[in-house]
Amino acid sequence: LVDFCMEIVQIYPRGNIEYADQFVLSVLFDKEELLSMGMQEGQTELSDLYIEEDEFNKLYKLWKDPDYLDDFFENNKEFFEDDYWNDITKARFISDVTSSAPFIFREIRTLFDEGKLDEIFEPLGREDKAREPFMSIRVKSKFGRINRRVAFRIYAIKIEDGCYVITGGAIKVVEEMHMAPNTTIELNKLNYAYAEIG
C-alpha cells in the first residue's frame, strides 16, 4: 500500500490573502498518485516538464503544447472519428485548442478578479447538486470551443461559496466521463481529492 501525500497550492488571490473573499487552490499530484489514478508511464503529463506543476497551471501549459495535442488527437482518434466531431482534422483540433486556451485562462482570471467564481462552476452531477446546500461538492466548468463544440472542462471541489480546489481538467471527447481514458483519469483525480478534502 502506497501512502500518498496530495499537495495543495494557492493560485488565487496572488499575494496577500488577508482581505480576500474568494480562494482558488490547485492540487499538485505526485507521479505515484497519478499512476494510481490510471495514467501510464510515458504520458506527457508525467514528464519532467509537467510533473512539478499544479493541475491548473499544468492545464494551461498542456493546452498550448502542440506536441501534447498531437499525441492527444492520435490517442483519441476513435472518438474524433465519431459523427459528433464532424470529421475534425488533427490540424483543426490543434489550432482550435491552442487558440482557445489563452482566452479560457484569461476569462478565468478575469472572473477571479471580479469575484464571480460561483458563476463558472456547476455541480458535476445530480448527486452533487443534491448535496450542495450542505457540504463540499464536486464541480465542473465548461469553456472554449473545438470545431463548434464546448469541449474544455476544469474540475474542482467547491468547499464553500468562493472557495475552490482545482483537481484537473480535460478536453472532453465523449458525453460520459467514464467512456474515455482522459476523463476517467480526471474523475479518479476528482474523487481522490474529494475523499481527502470533502
Question: PLM features: residue spans?
Answer:
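Basic, Lys/Arg-enriched alpha-helical interface segments
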Residues: 2-151, 173-198
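Short acidic loop-to-beta-strand element that houses the catalytic metal-binding Asp/Glu
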Residues: 153-156
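Active-site beta-strand-loop-beta-strand hairpin of nuclease catalytic cores
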Residues: 158-166
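Short conserved catalytic/interaction loops centered on acidic-Pro-aromatic/His motifs
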Residues: 165-168, 175-176
